[in-house]
């Protein structure tokens, strides 16, 4: 399926909240919540997007003409490229009231398995979502990472029990969801967690723990000290704090602070293989992408998602080739200017 066809189909199917813009840059959706927008004043997603595009590439083609390999080893798993599809809490609340997030999670896992990347799924606003996601991950060889919101410690541990039984290659805990208005509305016990509580959860999990929602070097050090195997530099796509810095802006200081201690994933406004290259050049180990995976799902379900993944792969390989990187470990800050 051609990606242009995916976008054309998505426009017909996605519902009123997303316009399937030629550039998924957060301008049209603004602060539309419920929907794909950012927390008021509504500029967070666009700030993320602009920050990546402010980073320029240093082209250098005086290198041996050798094949480009985008594969990495990540938390004990080999991935064909450093890419994870990001979790989504609900389609009914955010996009289309007739749609089921479980089908989206299933399609993402299928596409991830086909393409050799990783997917993830949230615990959602529906109690049926998390158990289904764990079963989906198990069915697809543990490729889908469960992502757990900061509810009560009792609820978190119950979800970790399900994750431990399904044995995906990692599990993630989101610290910044405490700022999601719709989560607090349906789950009044949602809230921030202390470093001691994070340490308790990391020890409770039987698989590598990824802490999502890190936006400062100080926060990254606290997550690493708590026992996280990886962190996700994320402002929740601009959905939890108006006026937050862009993820590309804070990534360098976080890499410098903990890059030798934990794996670093970054999300927020990453839309192309060239953006993936920019993130890796700063020092990230992998990236997460959310909104375009939703668009691709509405444009062709599993086939649409596969089309988007392969588009990203082609763009990443082309950028690597033109900047002199033949494998992911070749990419460094000398290949960009920012």
Question: What positions do the PLM features span?
Answer:
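An N-cap/entry alpha-helix motif that binds or orients negatively charged groups
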Residues: 2-80
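Flexible, glycine/proline-enriched loop segments at strand-loop-helix junctions
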Residues: 95, 121-122, 144-151, 183-189
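Alpha/beta enzyme core
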Residues: 110, 138-139, 151-266, 273-296, ...
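Internal helix-turn-beta structural module
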Residues: 285, 301-329
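Long, hydrophobic, well-ordered secondary-structure blocks that form the structural core
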Residues: 129-155
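A short, charged, Gly/Pro-tolerant segment at domain boundaries
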Residues: 330-338
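Aromatic/hydrophobic pocket-lining residues that form π-stacking "cages" and hydrophobic walls in ligand
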Residues: 108, 133, 254, 316
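N-terminal functional module of multi-domain proteins
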Residues: 44-130
């Amino acid at each position: 399926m051609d990606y242009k066809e995916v976008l054309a189909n998505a426009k017909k199917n996605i519902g009123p909240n997303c316009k399937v813009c030629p550039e998924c840059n957060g301008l049209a959706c603004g602060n539309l919540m419920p929907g794909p927008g950012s927390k008021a004043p509504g500029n967070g997603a666009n700030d993320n997007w602009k920050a990546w595009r402010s980073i320029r590439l240093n082209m250098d083609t005086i290198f041996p003409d050798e094949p480009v390999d985008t594969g990495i080893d990540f938390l004990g798993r080999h991935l064909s490229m450093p890419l994870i599809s990001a979790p989504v809490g609900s389609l009914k609340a955010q996009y289309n009231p007739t749609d089921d997030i479980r089908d989206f999670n299933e399609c993402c896992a299928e596409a991830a398995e086909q393409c050799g990347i990783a997917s993830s799924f949230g615990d959602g606003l529906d109690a049926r979502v998390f158990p289904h996601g764990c079963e989906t991950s198990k069915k697809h060889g543990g490729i889908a990472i469960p992502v757990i919101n900061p509810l009560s410690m009792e609820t978190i541990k119950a979800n970790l029990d399900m994750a431990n039984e399904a044995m995906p290659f990692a599990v993630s805990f989101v610290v910044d969801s405490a700022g999601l208005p719709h989560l607090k509305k349906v789950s009044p016990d949602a809230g921030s967690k202390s470093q001691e509580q994070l340490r308790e959860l990391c020890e409770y999990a039987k698989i590598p723990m990824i802490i999502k929602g890190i936006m400062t070097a100080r926060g990254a050090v606290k997550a690493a000290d708590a026992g996280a195997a990886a962190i996700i530099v994320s402002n929740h796509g601009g959905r939890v704090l108006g006026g937050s810095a862009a993820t590309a802006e804070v990534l360098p200081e976080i890499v410098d602070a903990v890059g030798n201690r934990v794996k670093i994933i970054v999300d927020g406004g990453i839309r192309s293989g060239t953006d993936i290259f920019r993130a890796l050049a700063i020092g990230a180990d992998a990236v997460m992408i959310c909104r375009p995976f939703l668009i691709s799902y509405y444009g062709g379900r599993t086939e649409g998602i596969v089309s988007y993944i392969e588009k990203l792969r082609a763009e990443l390989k082309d950028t690597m080739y033109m900047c002199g990187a033949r494998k992911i470990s070749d990419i460094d800050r000398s290949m960009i200017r920012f």
